[in-house]
């Protein structure tokens, strides 16, 4: 993995649902992926992972060692339900506790990057106070992450507060901390009125990973590859020419499909073909 190969991963929700990480990582290996990104979303089932016992955490670490497939990142979308910008003090406190537990979990199992959802609030009306609370919550979160040596990385979202790399960079400059970086989603970035290539270039030096999916304006999930507006070849070329050498993660939600593995294999081949056209020959 320290060669010039492009690290290519798959999102947990693309693979069959379940809690056996050995089976999940074995399937990812069979499908040719280097890593799997874990999801801790707003459902009680996935949130409960943050309360795993020592034995459960060790089982994940052992599965990683046995398969050679890493789990280097976590997509922490639980803050939709418990936002850091909430005006309800109890909800906000829960959001901060989820952050603390996620950072501790990451430290325990070797996760290096926690991808954050860029919502001040999601189910409520946003205002200046929710944005202030969100900024303060991020500051407190980054302090915790610094002590644990875990990187918090902001996703470029399906939401106006954080729908461009330029906006996320504003938070990076505000926090001014090496443990806060960016994790752009080229699908979300392309669905808004952004100069996508300029945005990607602006983020170089702060981008720690890239989500790969297709989108349409106003449609941010479950758009089949090749049917949306994303110019994948150009995005890959821009990132390569700008010096980005980090991981790419195919983001899909096919865990409930009739044959998730077949859906993932089809997407993998499609993405790798675009990578090869962009001159990322190691991915071909």
From Swiss-Prot:
Highest taxon above the source species: Bacteria
Record's note on what induces expression: Induced by L-ascorbate. Repressed by UlaR.
Q: Provide the E.C. number(s) assigned to this enzyme.
A: 5.1.3.22
Q: List the disulfide bonds.
A: none
Give UniProt keywords alphabetically.
Answer: Isomerase
Q: Which InterPro entries match?
A: L-Ru-5P_3-Epase (IPR004560), L-Ru-5P_3-Epase_Enterobacteria (IPR023492), Sugar_Epim/Isomerase (IPR050417), Xyl_isomerase-like_sf (IPR036237), Xyl_isomerase-like_TIM-brl (IPR013022)
Biological process (GO) annotations? Answer: L-ascorbic acid catabolic process
Phosphoprotein as a keyword of this entry, yes or no, is: no
Outline what the protein does. Catalyzes the isomerization of L-xylulose-5-phosphate to L-ribulose-5-phosphate. Is involved in the anaerobic L-ascorbate utilization.
Indicate the family of this protein. Belongs to the L-ribulose-5-phosphate 3-epimerase family.
Which NCBIfam families does this chain map to? hxl6Piso_put, PRK13209.1, PRK13210.1
Q: What is this protein called?
A: L-ribulose-5-phosphate 3-epimerase UlaE
Question: What is the species listed in this Swiss-Prot or TrEMBL entry?
Answer: Escherichia coli O127:H6 (strain E2348/69 / EPEC)
State the encoding gene.
ulaE
């Amino acid at each position: 993995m320290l060669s010039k190969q492009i690290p290519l991963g798959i999102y947990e929700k693309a693979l069959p649902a379940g809690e056996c990480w050995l089976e999940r990582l074995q399937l990812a290996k069979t499908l040719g992926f280097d890593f799997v990104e874990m999801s801790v979303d707003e459902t009680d089932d996935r949130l409960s992972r943050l309360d795993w016992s020592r034995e459960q955490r060790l089982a994940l670490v052992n599965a990683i060692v046995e398969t050679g497939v890493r789990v280097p990142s976590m997509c922490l979308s639980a803050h939709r339900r418990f936002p850091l910008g909430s005006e309800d003090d109890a909800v906000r406190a829960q959001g901060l506790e989820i952050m603390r537990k996620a950072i501790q979990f990451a430290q325990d199992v070797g996760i290096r990057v926690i991808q954050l959802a860029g919502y001040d609030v999601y189910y409520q009306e946003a205002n200046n106070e929710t944005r202030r609370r969100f900024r303060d919550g991020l500051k407190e979160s980054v302090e915790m992450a610094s002590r644990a040596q875990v990187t918090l990385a902001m996703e470029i979202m399906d939401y106006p507060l954080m729908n461009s790399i330029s906006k996320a960079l504003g938070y990076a400059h505000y926090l001014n901390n090496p443990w806060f970086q960016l994790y752009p989603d080229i699908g979300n970035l392309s669905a808004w009125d952004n100069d996508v290539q300029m945005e990607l270039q602006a983020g170089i030096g702060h981008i720690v990973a890239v989500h790969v999916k297709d989108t349409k304006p106003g449609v941010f999930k479950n758009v089949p590859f090749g049917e949306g507006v994303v110019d994948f070849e150009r995005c890959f070329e821009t990132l390569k020419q700008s010096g980005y050498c980090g991981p790419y993660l195919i983001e899909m939600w096919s865990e409930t499909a009739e044959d998730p593995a077949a859906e993932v294999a089809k997407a993998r081949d499609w993405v790798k073909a675009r990578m090869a056209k962009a001159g990322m020959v190691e991915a071909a």
